[in-house]
Amino acid sequence: MTDKTENSGLSSDATEVRAQKLKLLREQIGDVYPAHFHRTMTNAELAEKYQDLAPDTETQDLVTVAGRVYSSRNSGMFMDIHDASGKIQVFSHKDTTPEEARGLLPMIDLGDVIGVTGLVRRTKRGELTINAQQITMLTKSLLPMPEKYHGLADIETRYRKRYLDIMVNEESKLRFQQRSRIVSSLRRFLEDEGFMEVETPMLQPIYGGATAEPFKTHHNTLKLDMYLRIAPELYLKRVLVSGLTDKVFEINRNFRNEGVSTRHNPEFTMMECYWAYADYEDVMGLVERMFETLALAVHGTTEFEFGDKQLSFKGPFPRVSMPAAVKDATGIDFLAIKSDEEARQAARDAGVEIEKDATWGEVLAFLFEEKVEATLIQPAHVIHFPKDISPFAKEVPGEPRLVERFETYCNGWEIGNAFSELNDPVEQRARMVEQMEQAHARGEKEKTLDEDFLDAMDQGMPPAGGLGIGVDRLIMLLTNSPSIRDIILFPARRHKSD
């Protein structure tokens, strides 16, 4: 019952031993990979049903379970098998287990998937156990299983072979179970708030809704270059124009052909929603309710640990304008600065290198990123962004250089981005033309106007608040995961030979 064997008829190589056992099993029992196996309950259901069974107690209850063999003792007399819900001990002995079933034990290796039928008992030591009466080979594993209690030492192997990571690392398994719970809770929260879920194109003839480098592909039949979407925004706004619903959301993948880091993966999950007849103030309240709901779903409380920090998702969150935050950090009063050159010089005087053609708003945003962002540990809304980096947001009344936009930060990370959405079609066209010209100046010659979206805006979009949430980063916070690779099942990796 190990990856080494004393049987002189078998190879000493663990992989070869398994291959030889597979051959013997095929000869002895036929189908080693049956199409179906009926179990009467999961391991967790078994544990719950018999939680009050006293030690050293036997029952006449016959059950059938299945799972992967994780450990074996006394030549297979005791085995621990795991399904997705938990562990159960299996006991095989000549007094309780027929010879035919015991005859299978030498053929079972760690990592094999087996089915067991037997009687439930609890041992003197209090271990819930099944006295095996029948053992069925369901899947013969041809590769040795990583050691359960040492896990995978190589972090790259954990990412490249996630199935092994989850198989031997309970923390990884729990993390991805929590991810599923968070996404389900997010969807349920939005539905309870009255939002309708829709699906918009992942393949788009014109990319838009954000400033990012897209992945490009080609549709052979349509003879059309297309792009994996960088954002669903322009399609979700079309939904608002249509009148299908006043509250719309989508949870799905976005793709950006850009850098990879502990917070960035080229394929990532976003939630975007749009709320007609609301503004960014309303959306701030929505974010606070959302964060509180998700923290309660995962932790049962709004207080939880991330690394060495104690975070609180209990609203309301503090609010600070971007110009005020930068002034507090640097002493530079951007609202008193009148020109782009004056803004650039102020940055240089503060010891910050800036692009020679950076605008007033770009300088303000850059200084915020450099001097403020990392200090925002507890959740906070940063409001009033520069208009020249926010082409889809309404102006702040009385301050035409700023817009009604906020980003929600936590642990120094941007988690959410929201606007009072621009719905003036004339102004929208002007800003998108300017955005396109800036893209062309950066060498993005393929960037074009989305005339269909602008036609939709001409039909009239109601006033609305819009929100995008980086679901992966939010999950990182809620699961105490320092890297985005820890919460994406199969993150993008460089080819192993590179």
From Swiss-Prot:
Keywords: Aminoacyl-tRNA synthetase, ATP-binding, Cytoplasm, Ligase, Magnesium, Metal-binding, Nucleotide-binding, Protein biosynthesis
Alphabetical list of CDD domains matching this protein: LysRS_core, LysRS_N
Cofactor remark from the record: Binds 3 Mg(2+) ions per subunit.
Catalytic reaction list: tRNA(Lys) + L-lysine + ATP = L-lysyl-tRNA(Lys) + AMP + diphosphate
Binding, Mg(2+) 1: E407, E414
One family name in Pfam for this protein: tRNA-synt_2
Any one cellular-component term (Gene Ontology): cytosol
Residues the entry annotates as binding Mg(2+) 2: E414
Top class in the EC scheme: ligase
InterPro entries: Aa-tRNA-synt_II, aa-tRNA-synth_II, aa-tRNA-synth_II/BPL/LPL, Lys-tRNA-ligase_II, Lys-tRNA-ligase_II_N, Lys-tRNA-synth_II_C, NA-bd_OB-fold, NA-bd_OB_tRNA
Molecular-function GO term, any one: ATP binding
Entry's Gene Ontology BP terms: lysyl-tRNA aminoacylation
Main localization category: cytoplasm
Domain of life the protein comes from: Bacteria
CC cofactor: Mg(2+)
Record-listed E.C. numbers: 6.1.1.6
Annotated PROSITE patterns: AA_TRNA_LIGASE_II
Cell compartments where the protein resides: Cytoplasm
Gene3D superfamilies in the record: Bira Bifunctional Protein, Domain 2, Nucleic acid-binding proteins
Assembly notes: Homodimer.
PANTHER family noted in UniProt: LYSINE--TRNA LIGASE, CHLOROPLASTIC_MITOCHONDRIAL (PTHR42918:SF15), LYSYL-TRNA SYNTHETASE (PTHR42918)
Homology family: Belongs to the class-II aminoacyl-tRNA synthetase family.
UniProt-recorded name of the protein: Lysine--tRNA ligase
Species, as recorded: Sinorhizobium medicae (strain WSM419)
Classification lineage: Bacteria, Pseudomonadati, Pseudomonadota, Alphaproteobacteria, Hyphomicrobiales
Gene this protein is translated from: lysS
